[in-house]
From Swiss-Prot:
It catalyses: N(6),N(6),N(6)-trimethyl-L-lysyl(4)-[histone H3] + 3 2-oxoglutarate + 3 O2 = L-lysyl(4)-[histone H3] + 3 formaldehyde + 3 succinate + 3 CO2. Residues 1019-1077 form the FYR N-terminal domain. The gene is JMJ703. Expressed in roots, leaf sheaths, stems and panicles. It comes from Oryza sativa subsp. japonica (Rice). This is Lysine-specific demethylase JMJ703. Residues 62-79, 245-259, 910-923, 964-978 have a biased composition (Polar residues). Residues 1079-1169 form the FYR C-terminal domain. Keywords: Chromatin regulator, Dioxygenase, Iron, Metal-binding, Nucleus, Oxidoreductase, Transcription, Transcription regulation.
Length: 1238
């Protein structure tokens, strides 16, 4: 021990290590006979391993000797020298190993890493007494210690001008090549140079932004700290939410403000001008090798120095980063569409799909179905960086795509890991940073931890490098981890996008979030269902309206049973059904209100999205849970729990079938859920009627199932509390409409939010359970419930019902007047064979009928004991049915009628192919006085007379012009109550009596009830119209372009005045137009002149105007419910004739159309008028073609060009035909006739 005299200041090494003095005379390898000398180590690695083992064994001895030996307190350098002073080891063999690569150094850092990290000297001194945005850089670039990772490069793509036009299509095209890398670079065409608005002087010098202070040396190597500052990730949130709500959400999962977490402290505010000065000053000071010259490092030099600082720091390096700057406040670098657009170039870039302000909501991105502006997801973020400012390893929220564009500046280095290696990256980081993950299990969600790509690569994780330059895009793929840093001052902008292929990945993301109890950013179910509904809408437009637009074709191309969206929807439905089945049969199930998730609704336990379903309890009205955690919501009895479902099981199945391309499902979903506002379902119902072909269509009308009444999935008894809730929900089922005309004030009801699209139909939803014979209807009229135990229910029920218009064809009909519209059992069974019929339940005081509709059967839930009929609602006019088959309709001119079982049987015996438009069943005043409550009227009408009664024209009609009414006031446009109408006159001319109906409301009033609600005329009057032709159009051949009544010229336009559907008190002009629907023939369109948003389209002119009439009646009812007076009476069926309203029966217009068809190419029309005289310009009269010539014309139309030329040569030159040739031609014709007879 006396030989140990080394002090802290001695430079010479001691002859023997401290503490080994007494054993100095003994060789180390002589202690055991079987020991080998240390010099036998064959490699430096083996020697280093021996040193590491010896150093661990020496630690206790060194601790004991520290109090006795001055050397033990010397620092790491002295300890290192003592460890190297071992006679058996030749240390000269390791002198060539640098300090950075030495394993000895690594061992020493492991021993005293905490002390060394705490003792790192300051490399950057930021701020002073006078300002906070100045700096002094003490640390210097160390090229010798560079630790640049050896990685493969991510792919780079150079789209052409044509490829660059469609953003999502191009991303889809490169996905198979780029997704295996997780990241790629896209270099736009050289001509694409958008202006950067952030360089405007007002923003450059005047707009300040907040920054973060990043300690680069602690991004990877730091101790698990119990004290820290806020986290580095800002939670994506909606811009529209209030500051209070924003702050709350921000505290919960946004900027991690917990004092137990490591994070980035806030830095000073900068403008772009001052930040550039600060960033350039840092780079200049840090990379200056000496005072005599400046050095400009390459990207590779900066990369090597960055990872040296992260992995083996020697000084504390602080940098500033302006990250996550909301473009909504700071501004975007891309131009936006506005009236202030200065040039065509700006307008071009403002509309570009590569403009990050447009990208998330492009057609084909499911983010377009998110209504709110979510900062960072749908609203881009701006990033202003300097050298070494970093973005740490992370994936995008919900595993979305992200697109980053660099506006200007130094390169940005990216590192990407493909989605298939995401789990491997997480495992590798947990393995090497266990303390950090123990403290923060969600460490990777906070963007505060960097990790060496070299270490990831050594763990088998695929990592790729990408260098982004000014004017280039970087695209990251779903669940692809990425990180990086900036090489100097630059500015970039980024946003998310979600093509259809993201949907299954997004579903996995939200399920993962549920497991992690992590807050969501977007509603995945809302996006999925929104995309599915839009895809079905596109298929509707293509299949029924022949609108083969680019957008529609894009959506159609992604549909089908093998499509991604179909599989994603099926997977989500299966998950939902499993969860519902797990719950068993819920005691109380309700229809989810449309606005339920207008505010963010999340599971109180796992934060799962509640767009599709939710569970709740009366004890906590503002607290809901997902179906998985329904039992954990509260401690109340299970019977008190209620469940909200946006769609029932059958509706979800119909949605899936429609998305898969099933035509009937597309039709059902389009009618019931979409309610297309600008068109009707263009379907053809061809009905033969004495050589007349009529085309009928189903007209979809705006409806919102989400505004329906409460739904019970099974038959069960409910508590009074449930009944009160049903009554409360029922209030939302009152008739409502909405006008999209900007000049019209949007109407709102107390319990109904305004509809987002034009509405021409209202409905109640009534859902059945195919597993039960009973049915429960929550919230009948007036809030009452009706039950129908024992009624058979179809296995494929529909999810809404509307009063349907069904044509009736019969030679004898028995009508009775009762309170309410009553349909017989037989009539209902007849209608059940028509397919997808609908019903609309209307409110009426003191009555609460309920009706169910199962898609094939329509049955009421209340029995009428007196008449053996089933009662359904009565207060609404009938509306067009939705079926491709022939329907049966009883449409009285009043709100009340009944068809007995016996009478209805006669309906079935009538021809199902005959269509008769709704007509004016009327009753005289004297007769109604004698029968105040019920009267049996049996008019004997044959089918031809009945057709004429309903507004048709007979074959013998010599003049197609409209009739006039002497009892109507001129030009007032209102219906007047007169003793007879046109149908009555026509019926009397044929010897049939006129039947007048008594309104149910008046009967109810006479019986003591209060007379409320809209009035309907006792006598149906044809509306007297004066049509102004705007354009005659062009006549086309083909049977679809004419009928026995009128010719339908393509491009025909006319103008007529009728009650305004916006304000029924006023009259308004309507524009009627005939369009070309291709194979479907003519398409009839009517629109309100001063409100282009109100458009009605159908393949039948009469049904087209009937849609206008029904829309008018709905508005009258709505305004009447609001207490308005001086409203016109409800317009009954038959009050308007589509052909007349179009002007196609007006004599002047008819003459003009005839002039366009001098060759009589409209054969359907002229076949019924073989002797009509047409005046030519030379005042000569030409006789119309007779049947032989018409037959010849049909033959000629089927001939090809060569055959027509030969025929013309034969007919014009008599010399070509002698008697022999004529005989041969006749013989050939006779042979062909004989063949056809055989």
């Amino acid at each position: 021990m006396m030989g140990v005299t080394t002090t802290l200041n001695e430079d010479t090494e001691p002859s023997i290590p401290p503490g080994f003095g007494p054993f100095a005379t003994l060789p180390l390898w002589g202690i055991h006979n079987d020991a080998k000398p240390a010099v036998t180590h064959s490699t430096p690695v083996q020697a280093l391993q021996s040193i590491r083992k010896d150093s661990e064994e020496c630690q206790p001895s060194a601790a004991v000797s520290r109090s006795d030996t001055p050397c033990s307190t010397s620092g790491t350098q002295t300890c290192r020298k003592s460890l190297r002073n071992r006679p058996p080891i030749d240390y000269s063999r390791f002198e060539h190993i640098s300090d950075e690569d030495s394993d000895v150094e690594i061992v020493e850092k492991d021993v005293s890493s905490t002390r060394r990290r705490q003792q790192l000297p300051k490399g950057v001194l930021r701020g002073c007494a006078e300002c906070s945005d100045c700096q002094k850089v003490i640390a210097k670039w160390n090229p010798a210690g560079a630790r640049r990772p050896v990685l493969d490069e991510a792919p780079v793509f150079y789209p052409t001008e044509e490829e660059f036009e469609d953003t999502l299509k191009y991303i889809e095209s490169i996905r198979p090549m780029a997704e295996p890398y997780g990241i790629c670079r896209i270099v736009p065409p050289s001509s694409w140079k958008p202006p950067c608005l952030l360089k405007d002087k007002s923003i450059w010098e005047g707009s300040k932004f907040s920054t973060r202070v990043q300690k680069v040396d602690k991004l990877q190597n730091r101790k698990s700290s119990k004290k820290g500052r806020r986290g580095g990730m800002m939670k994506r949130r909606k811009l529209a939410e209030s500051e209070e709500n924003s702050a709350t959400a921000h505290t919960q999962t946004g900027m991690q403000q917990s004092p137990e977490r490591f994070g980035f402290e806030p830095g000073p505010e900068f403008t772009l001008q001052t930040f550039q000065k600060y960033a350039d000053d840092f780079s200049k000071q840090y990379f200056r090798k000496d005072t005599s010259m400046d050095s400009v490092p390459s990207v590779e030099d900066i990369e090597g120095e960055y990872w040296r600082i992260v992995e083996v720091p020697t000084e504390e390096i602080e940098v500033i980063y302006g990250a996550d700057l909301e473009t909504g406040t700071f501004g975007s670098g891309f131009p936006k569409l506005s009236p202030e657009t200065k040039s065509d170039a700006e307008d071009k870039y403002a509309q570009s799909g590569w403009n990050l302000n447009n990208l998330p909501r492009l057609q084909g991105s499911v983010l377009s179905f998110e209504g709110g502006d979510i900062s960072g997801v749908l609203v881009p973020w701006v990033y202003v960086g300097m050298c070494f400012s970093s973005f740490c390893w992370h994936v995008e929220d919900h595993h979305l795509y992200s697109l980053n564009y660099m506006h200007w500046g130094a390169p940005k280095l990216w590192y990407g890991v493909p989605g298939k290696d995401a789990v491997n990256l997480e495992s590798a980081m947990r393995k090497h940073l266990p303390e950090l993950f123990e403290e923060q299990p969600d460490l990777l969600h906070n963007l505060v931890t960097q990790f060496s790509p070299s270490l990831l690569k050594s763990e088998g994780v695929h990592v790729y490098r990408c260098v982004q330059h000014e004017g280039e895009f970087v695209l990251t793929f779903p669940r692809a981890y990425h990180a990086g840093f900036n090489c100097g001052f630059n500015c970039a902008e980024a946003v998310n996008v979600a093509p259809i292929d993201w949907l299954p990945i997004g579903h996995n993301a939200v399920e993962l979030y549920r497991e992690q109890a992590r807050k969501i950013t977007i509603s995945h179910d809302k996006l999925l269902l929104g995309a599915a509904r839009e895809a079905i809408r596109a298929q509707w437009d293509i299949l029924f309206l022949k609108r083969n637009t680019a957008d529609n074709m894009r959506w159609k191309s992604i549909c089908g049973a093998d499509s991604t969206i179909f599989k994603a929807l099926k997977a989500r439905i299966e998950t939902e059904l499993v969860q519902r089945k797990t719950l068993g049969v819920p005691a109380q199930s309700r229809k989810m209100d449309a606005e339920f998730d207008s505010i963010d609704r999340e599971c109180a336990l796992c934060y799962y999205d509640l767009h599709l379903s939710a569970s709740g309890c009366p004890c906590c009205p503002e607290k809901y849970a997902c179906l998985v955690h329904a039992k954990q919501l509260c401690s109340c009895d299970w019977d008190k729990r209620f469940f909200l479902f946006r769609y029932d099981v059958n509706e979800l199945n119909i949605l899936a079938d429609a998305l898969g391309g099933k035509l009937s499902a597309i039709h059902r979903w389009g009618v019931s859920d979409l309610g297309l506002s600008l068109s009707s379902c263009v379907k053809r119902e061809k009905v033969q009627d004495s050589k007349t072909v009529r085309r009928l269509t189903d007209g979809p009308r705006r409806s919102y199932m989400s505004q329906a009444s409460a739904v019970s999935l099974v038959s069960s008894s409910t508590s009074n509390e449930q009944k009160d809730e049903g009554n409360k929900i029922m209030k939302i089922a009152s008739p409502q409409t909405n006008n999209v005309c900007p000049s019209v004030e949007q109407r709102k009801s107390e319990n109904i939010s305004p509809l987002k699209e034009p509405c021409v139909r209202n409905e109640l939803s009534c859902t059945t359970n195919s597993d039960s014979n009973g049915l429960q209807y929550n919230g009948g009229l007036g809030g009452h419930k009706g039950s129908a135990p024992g009624l058979p229910v179809s296995s494929s029920p529909s999810f809404s019902s509307n009063v349907a218009t069904r044509p009736i064809s019969t030679s004898s009909v028995s009508m009775k007047i009762v309170q309410g519209l009553v349909a017989s059992k037989s009539c209902i069974q007849a209608s059940s064979r028509t397919g997808d019929s609908r019903s609309l339940l209307g409110e009426h005081h003191n009555r609460s009928p309920a009706m169910i509709h199962d898609g094939t059967n329509m049955k009421s839930s209340l029995e009428s004991s007196n008449n053996s009929c089933r009662l359904i609602a009565s207060d609404y006019n009938a509306t067009p049915c939705h079926s491709s088959k022939d329907q049966v309709l009883v449409t009285p001119g009043t709100n009340a009628s009944v068809v007995t079982l016996k009478d209805s049987s006669q309906v079935h015996s009538a021809s199902s192919q005959q269509f008769v438009r709704t007509g004016p069943w009327t009753q005289s005043a004297s007769h109604e006085a004698s029968s105040p409550s019920t009267s049996a009227l049996k008019p004997s009408l044959d089918p031809p007379a009945m057709k004429n009664l309903y507004g048709g024209f007979t074959q013998g009609s010599a003049h197609p012009g409209p009739p006039s009414f002497s009892n109507q006031q001129p030009n007032d446009g209102r219906l007047q109550r007169t003793s007879e109408s046109l149908p009555g006159v026509e019926a009397r001319a044929r010897g049939h009596p006129t039947v007048t109906a008594q309104p149910a409301l008046e009967i109810h009033s006479r019986n003591g009830g209060a007379q409320k609600g809209p009035r309907i005329a006792n006598v149906v009057h044809r509306f007297k119209c004066s049509v102004e032709p705007l354009e005659i159009g062009v006549v086309l051949s083909g049977r679809l372009w004419s009928s026995s009544q009128a010719i339908f010229p393509k491009g025909f336009r006319s103008r007529v005045k009728y009650f305004s559907i916006v304000d029924p008190i006023q009259m308004a002009y309507y524009i009627s137009e005939i369009l070309d629907a291709g194979m479907q023939g003519p398409l009839f369109m009517v629109k309100l002149e001063n409100c282009p948003g109100e458009v009605f389209i159908n393949l039948s002119p009469t049904k087209c105007w009937n849609m206008v009439r029904e829309r008018l009646n709905m508005e009258i009812r709505r305004q009447l419910n609001m207490g308005k007076s001086n409203l016109p009476t409800l317009q009954p069926p038959g009050s308007v004739d589509g052909l007349e309203m179009f002007g196609l029966l007006s004599p002047p217009i008819v003459q003009a159309i005839w002039a366009r068809d001098r060759d009589h190419i409209c054969t359907e029309y002229w076949r019924s008028r073989p002797h009509v005289l047409i005046e030519d310009p030379n005042n000569r009269h030409m006789l119309s073609q007779g049947p032989p010539l018409l037959a010849l014309r049909g033959l000629i139309q089927r001939a090809n060009r060569d055959e027509l030329q030969v025929l013309r040569s034969l007919m014009t030159n008599s010399n070509n035909l002698d008697d022999s040739s004529r005989q041969q031609a006749a013989h050939i014709i006779e042979e062909e006739i004989a063949k056809q007879l055989c």
